[in-house]
Amino acid sequence: MENVIDILGKTINRKLHLAKVSHDYSMVQTFFHQAFGAVELAMAMINDWEKEAVIIDKWEREWEPAFEKIMMEV
């Protein structure tokens, strides 16, 4: 069974893909907020500070900047 971080990564990568192909700023924002909601849900589901730190790090270093880049391009 996959762990929460793997599932979260797949979910956010799917939202990033949809944002890239949408070519619509409001849709990109929608996918960004859905991805952030997934991060919040994942954080609520786990009770492990180390995993939470990994999720926060991935959000701040990978996923959020990727969404910001897409928003700048649209």
Annotate each PLM feature.
Residues 17-31, 46-54:
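Charged, low-complexity interaction regions
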Residues 1-24:
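Short terminal alpha-helical segments
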Residues 18, 41-48, 65, 69:
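Amphipathic alpha-helical interaction surfaces
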Residues 10, 17, 51, 60-61:
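Intrinsic disorder/low-complexity segments
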Residues 30-44:
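Alpha-helical oligomerization interfaces
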Residues 5-7, 12, 46, 55-56, ...:
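Weak global preference for isoleucine
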Residues 52-74:
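Charged low-complexity stretches with an acidic bias
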